[in-house]
C-alpha cells in the first residue's frame, strides 16, 4: 500500500536495495528525481504505449537475472488516504504474469503519521506488515484479486 512518502525511503532499509517501479511523472520533482535515479528506479510512461515501455519488461528481467534486488511497485499507482481503497492498477499483475515471480505483499499504515495532504503527526506509530508471499501460480486477474484482498484486509487490522 502507498499512503505517504515514508514508504519510498523506509522500504530501502528493510529490503535489499530494491528497484522501485514508478510513474514517469515523478521524474519531474526536483531533488527527488536525483534520489530515484541514484537508487536505480525504473519508470514507466502510463499514458501511452512507447518504445521505452516496450523495453520495460526486458529491463526488469535483466535486473532479476543479474542481481538479487527485489522489485517494489505500489499497486494503487499513487498515494492514497488511509481509508481509501481504490482498485489496484493492472501494472503489478502484468509484471507478475510476465516475469513469473512471487510477490511479497506489504501493508503500511503510514498515512496516519505522514499523510498525503496535511500535517505530520509524530505521536502516532507506523506499522509495517510483511505478508505471506503470493506464488506465481495464478492468472493476472486472480493475482490482482488476491493481492488487493490481502493488502486491504491487513490495512483494516492496522487502522
Where do the PLM segments sit?
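Non-catalytic C-terminal accessory region of glycerolipid acyltransferases
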Residues: 13, 54-159
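Catalytic core of membrane glycerolipid acyltransferases/transacylases, capturing the structured
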Residues: 1-49
Amino acid at each position: 500500500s502507498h499512503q505517504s512518502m515514508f514508504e519510498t525511503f523506509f522500504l530501502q532499509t528493510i529490503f535489499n536495495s530494491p528497484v522501485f517501479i514508478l510513474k514517469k511523472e515523478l521524474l519531474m520533482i526536483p531533488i527527488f528525481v536525483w534520489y530515484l535515479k541514484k537508487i536505480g528506479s525504473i519508470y514507466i510512461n502510463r499514458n501511452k504505449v512507447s518504445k521505452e515501455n516496450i523495453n520495460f519488461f526486458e529491463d526488469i528481467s535483466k535486473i532479476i537475472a543479474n542481481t538479487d534486488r527485489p522489485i517494489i511497485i505500489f499497486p494503487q499507482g499513487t498515494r492514497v488516504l488511509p481509508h481509501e481503497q481504490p482498485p489496484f492498477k493492472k501494472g503489478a499483475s502484468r509484471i507478475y504474469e510476465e516475469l513469473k515471480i512471487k510477490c511479497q505483499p506489504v501493508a503500511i499504515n503510514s498515512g496516519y503519521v505522514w499523510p498525503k495532504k496535511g500535517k505530520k503527526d509524530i505521536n502516532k506509530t507506523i506499522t509495517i506488515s510483511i505478508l505471506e508471499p503470493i506464488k506465481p501460480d495464478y492468472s493476472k486477474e486472480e493475482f490482482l484479486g488476491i493481492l488487493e484482498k490481502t493488502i486491504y484486509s491487513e490495512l483494516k487490522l492496522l487502522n
